[in-house]
């Protein structure tokens, strides 16, 4: 009905809805680019666009920029990163940090030794027999995947016909290339049941650039990951609309219009020449978007895992121990979902990071209950004097490892996905479009910004 009335009045649907919602000219913001999402990719894009002389408006649902890059500060102001803990030490990273005048240094984990524990039994075990440690495993793995050089920048530049090895089950790829002794090390850098994954997605978690970064070392802001986004927020100022969500979007060949609602219920009409979408393109995230048939078809194909990052205090665990989960009953020691990936200590006494992964039904309540059960089991078995901890932060990193079937990839899914760039003045970036590591996302975002500039 709104569309028919808008056409009759000679208005865009969004402009009509703006009138219907009582939005007047004083509640309208005009910018060159409207950015949906102020996480790693959206914030980077905003700074780069500003440097190119463009005006921007960043729409972010949280009350902070940075997405998964969160930092908790203790009473003595010690920064504890959870979620994103560092960046690849590359020119892209260094230029960005220096551009925002954020002091940085090498990322050194807190001193600790690793205890291998089967978290299904609560008992100590050993590193999976016959499995290589990280450095040796990565060298063997990189040699096997060097044939897929088109993935070396983290973007899904997949040739057609698609190499069958690339879309084979990872377990089959392991056997074909005799990688059985490298599986556990690779699992520790993925998210999900690695034995059930398609090889492509394992590479996008621990490919050539990732292995190089692990060998060369990461960097991180000295005052915490959040310091980067605080600096960006200060520079962007009122161009960032925090605690704000899009309600209606209209896209044309010559511009876009977006109605957004802030936390206090205020509605604003944003008008832009281009739209940059950095949020995960799931159908449930795109309410209010009049999607094309191709967009709807592609975005309906996604599957993903649930990933939770917990920062806890007072667990009863020793301060100098990291717990690595090894399932001695499964092939290569790789746990089955849901599982606790690992428990890592922090630079502040008493604090630990706990990373939990599960399927689509592994919600926040289920994840917390699972975490408590595992800690109780460690206590019951006498492995550690654990008890129910204080949850300082419990952050959702869902969706993680967004993937589609081998049949979809073989049929040109990623080619069709990238063909969406620029249609109806809309561009896309973020973890769906490249490997989910900030440095690689920034590199791909630069490519998208070049496309926007030339369109």
Curated annotation (Swiss-Prot):
The protein's matches in InterPro entries, at most eight in alphabetical order, are given as: Amino_oxidase (IPR002937), FAD/NAD-bd_sf (IPR036188)
Q: Name one GO molecular function term.
A: beta-cyclopiazonate dehydrogenase activity
**Which of UniProt's keywords are assigned here?**
FAD, Flavoprotein, Oxidoreductase, Signal, Virulence
Q: Where is the signal peptide?
A: 1-25
Enzyme category, top tier:
oxidoreductase
> What changes when the gene is disrupted?
Impairs the production of cyclopiazonic acid, but accumulates its biosynthetic intermediates cyclo-acetoacetyl-L-tryptophan and beta-cyclopiazonic acid.
Which pairs are disulfide-linked? none
Q: What is its EC number?
A: 1.21.99.1
Q: Which domain of life is it from?
A: Eukaryota
Q: Which Pfam families match?
A: Amino_oxidase
Its cofactor is:
FAD
Per its record, the protein catalyses:
beta-cyclopiazonate + A = alpha-cyclopiazonate + AH2
Annotated function: Beta-cyclopiazonate dehydrogenase; part of the gene cluster that mediates the biosynthesis of the fungal neurotoxin cyclopiazonic acid (CPA), a nanomolar inhibitor of Ca(2+)-ATPase with a unique pentacyclic indole tetramic acid scaffold. The hybrid two module polyketide synthase-nonribosomal peptide synthetase (PKS-NRPS) cpaS incorporates acetyl-CoA, malonyl-CoA, and tryptophan (Trp) and utilizes a C-terminal redox-incompetent reductase domain to make and release the tryptophan tetramic acid, cyclo-acetoacetyl-L-tryptophan (c-AATrp), as the first intermediate in the pathway.
What protein family is recorded? Belongs to the beta-cyclopiazonate dehydrogenase family.
Protein name (record): Beta-cyclopiazonate dehydrogenase
User: Which species expresses this protein natively?
Assistant: Aspergillus oryzae (Yellow koji mold)
Top-level taxonomy: Eukaryota, Fungi, Dikarya, Ascomycota, Pezizomycotina
């Amino acid at each position: 009905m709104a569309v028919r009335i808008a056409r009759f009045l000679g208005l865009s649907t969004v402009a009509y809805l703006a009138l219907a919602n009582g939005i007047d000219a004083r509640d309208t913001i005009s910018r060159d680019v409207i950015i949906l999402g102020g996480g790693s990719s959206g914030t980077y894009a905003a700074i780069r666009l500003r440097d190119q002389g463009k005006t921007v408006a960043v729409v972010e649902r949280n009350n902070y920029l940075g997405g998964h890059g969160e930092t908790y500060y203790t009473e003595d102001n010690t920064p504890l990163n959870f979620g994103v803990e560092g960046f690849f030490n590359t020119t892209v990273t260094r230029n960005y940090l220096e551009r925002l005048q954020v002091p940085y240094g090498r990322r050194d984990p807190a001193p600790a030794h690793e205890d291998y524990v089967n978290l299904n039994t609560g008992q100590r075990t050993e590193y999976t027999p016959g499995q290589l440690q990280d450095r040796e495993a990565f060298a063997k793995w990189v040699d096997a995947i060097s044939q897929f050089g088109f993935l070396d920048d983290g973007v899904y530049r997949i040739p057609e016909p698609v190499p069958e090895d690339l879309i084979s089950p990872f377990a089959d790829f392991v056997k074909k290339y005799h990688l059985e002794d490298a599986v556990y090390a690779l699992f520790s850098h993925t998210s999900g049941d690695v034995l059930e994954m398609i090889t492509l997605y394992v590479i996008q978690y621990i490919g050539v650039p990732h292995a190089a970064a692990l060998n060369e070392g990461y960097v991180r802001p000295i005052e915490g990951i959040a310091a980067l986004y605080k600096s960006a927020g200060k520079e962007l100022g009122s161009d960032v609309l925090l605690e704000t969500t899009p309600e209606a979007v209209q896209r044309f060949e010559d511009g876009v219009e977006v109605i957004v609602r802030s936390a206090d219920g205020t509605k604003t009409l944003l008008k832009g020449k281009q739209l940059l979408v950095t949020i995960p393109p799931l159908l449930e995230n795109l309410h209010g978007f009049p999607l094309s048939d191709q967009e709807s078809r592609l975005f309906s194909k996604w599957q993903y895992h649930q990933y939770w990052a917990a920062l806890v205090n007072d667990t009863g665990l020793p301060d100098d121990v990291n717990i690595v989960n090894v399932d001695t009953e499964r092939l290569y020691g790789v746990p089955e979902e849901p599982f606790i990936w690992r428990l890592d200590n922090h630079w502040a006494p008493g604090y630990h990071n706990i990373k939990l992964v599960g399927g689509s039904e592994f919600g926040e309540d289920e994840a917390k209950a699972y975490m408590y059960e595992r800690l109780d089991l460690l206590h019951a078995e006498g492995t550690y004097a654990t008890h129910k901890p204080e949850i300082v932060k419990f952050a959702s990193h869902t969706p993680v490892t967004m993937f589609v079937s081998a049949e979809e990839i073989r049929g040109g899914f990623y080619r069709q996905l990238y063909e969406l760039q620029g249609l109806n003045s809309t561009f896309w970036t973020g973890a769906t479009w490249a490997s989910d590591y900030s440095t690689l996302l920034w590199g791909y975002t630069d490519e998208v910004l070049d496309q926007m500039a030339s369109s």
